[in-house]
Amino acid sequence: MWVDSQIVMEDLEVFSNLDYLQWEKLRNKRILITGATGLIGSTLLKALMYVNKSKNLKLSLVALVRDKDKAESKFCDILRDTKELSFIVGQVEDLPDNIGKIDYIIHGASPTASDYFMKRPVETIKTAIIGTMNLLELAKEKQVDGMVYLSSMEIYGSPRNEEKLSEKDVGYIDPLVVRNCYPEAKRQCEAMCVAYANEYSVPVMSARLAQTFGPGVDSQDKRVFAEFARCAMQGKDIELLTDGSSKRCYLYTMDAVSGILTILLKGTSGNAYNVANEDTYCSIYEMAQEVAKNFANDTISVEILNDSEAQKKYPPAHFLNLDVKALIQLGWKPTKTLMEMYGRMIHQME
């Protein structure tokens, strides 16, 4: 078996035994994944390949990738074990013609780094808008059984109070701020999904994911959760470039995967669903303190630098307290606390 980590094996076993997922809907189906080499996409791919083997579903996965050599290297153990995973070289902005029959689409291709949003806002928008339009056209052409667009909790903008945010709530986003190219593009992509669902009866849903991490995070990842983990592992003080007052929910990688598949198999076309662990809601400063306490035995401190230039990379102070009731009503539930997420991520990084 190609699983070389006890933690990942535990996650896959739990995932494959989730009784609220309608596995039979995937039998003999062909699933297209974009963004398959990213954190969520790669976890999703591994999870589906594991379930396919354990339940003999005879499903096949095709991943759209920019760099086939990179993808084959990343998933070499799976490729040695099965013929039911294949790669198509291309990009979402210009889909290749050789995709073939598709039953389900999970569209996760997207930049995720704040630095990239600031330096390449045009490319951020083009990847989102053109890519999603192309995938929706493909879904219409192939008459797929279902499609999920991976959106973000950032579409809620910068709420100034801590009230729960349901899928019906909207927040303020200033389109004149360069970094907001990302949430504005995500909003437009969700609107396109609704348009295709209504005009062409494409069975498409959006998953509004909280910030997601766990096993599989690259040790050089620049996002704040990975930086906190590295500081704890190296015994370095955690330095915050903002005051750390923003509060949000988080999500474990495998919980993200189970949420996405719940939406794909049980969601209502045209709807969006929050995907988060409500119990993880905390400020960035509070999270830093908990990491220092739990993984560095309080031997490191949390310092607030308040770097005004660096702050331009980040959204203004906000409170993203997601209400996950709609997804829970479909049977989904998260499995890992915030510190469990950190523990499993750090174990993989070591």
Residue ranges of predicted features:
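Conserved Rossmann-fold NAD(P)-dependent oxidoreductase catalytic core, especially the SDR/UDP-sugar
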Residues: 133-180
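NAD(P)-dependent short-chain dehydrogenase/reductase
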Residues: 159-168, 191-248, 253-264, 289-294
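NAD(P)H-binding glycine-rich loop region in Rossmannoid oxidoreductase-like domains
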Residues: 83, 88-127
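N-terminal Rossmann NAD(P)H-binding glycine-rich loop of SDR-like oxidoreductase domains
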Residues: 30-50
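Active-site segment of SDR-like NAD(P)-dependent oxidoreductases
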Residues: 111-115, 153-160, 210-213
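Active-site helix of classical SDR
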Residues: 181, 185
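C-terminal substrate-binding subdomain of Rossmann-fold SDR/epimerase-dehydratase oxidoreductases
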Residues: 1-4, 86, 232, 236-350
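Amphipathic terminal alpha-helices
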Residues: 1-23, 46, 56-59, 337-350
